[in-house]
Structures are given as C-alpha cells and as structure tokens.
Amino acid sequence: MMLEHVLVLSAYLFSIGIYGLITSRNMVRALMCLELILNAVNINFVTFSDFFDSRQLKGNIFSIFVIAIAAAEAAIGPAIVSSIYRNRKSTRINQSNLLNK
C-alpha cells in the first residue's frame, strides 16, 4: 500500500477515537475510543518505520511496547469501571464525582 493510504486510514481511526472520547458519556465507550487512538498511533509507528528505514525495527518495537501498555489498560480499565459501577450504580462520566468527596 502507498504511504498516503495508510496515513489516511490512521488519521480516520485517530479522528474517530478523538471524537468518541470527547463526546462519550459512558466510561466503557471512552475506553474503546482510547484503544482506537492507540491503534492509530501503532499504525503510524509501523508505517513510518517501514517507509524510512526498513532495516531498523524501532517503530515495530515501540509499537509492541504500546500494545503491551494497551493490554494492561484493557485489563485494568474494565475492573475500575466495574468497581465504580458497583459503588455508584452508573458508568456515566458526568455523574462520577469521585474527587469531590
């Protein structure tokens, strides 16, 4: 694929993720949008790593590191959301006032 096509795909994914993160009122949806943003960044890392110097794997290694961070976020995030749901009976972001108490 050409570089422009991959970058446009990544920009679309990033834009959808940012839009969803800004407009989301549900914590689960916000976590999913955050994953979209991280995947768009990974696509950019791998694309630029392959385009500029395919012999060095710096972009690929950094992408694997971001995937590991995203896996930890995907494991811890729903646990935090379920804990908030048990205590507050809601997963809406605007109803979470945990720092006010």
Swiss-Prot record:
Broad enzyme group: translocase
Bilayer-crossing regions: 2-22, 32-52, 61-81
Superkingdom of this protein's organism: Eukaryota
Catalyzed reactions per annotation: a plastoquinone + NADH + (n+1) H(+)(in) = a plastoquinol + NAD(+) + n H(+)(out); a plastoquinone + NADPH + (n+1) H(+)(in) = a plastoquinol + NADP(+) + n H(+)(out)
Localization of this protein: Plastid, Chloroplast thylakoid membrane
Subunit (UniProt): NDH is composed of at least 16 different subunits, 5 of which are encoded in the nucleus.
Family per similarity comment: Belongs to the complex I subunit 4L family.
Record's function text: NDH shuttles electrons from NAD(P)H:plastoquinone, via FMN and iron-sulfur (Fe-S) centers, to quinones in the photosynthetic chain and possibly in a chloroplast respiratory chain. The immediate electron acceptor for the enzyme in this species is believed to be plastoquinone. Couples the redox reaction to proton translocation, and thus conserves the redox energy in a proton gradient.
Protein name listed in UniProt: NAD(P)H-quinone oxidoreductase subunit 4L, chloroplastic
Gene: ndhE
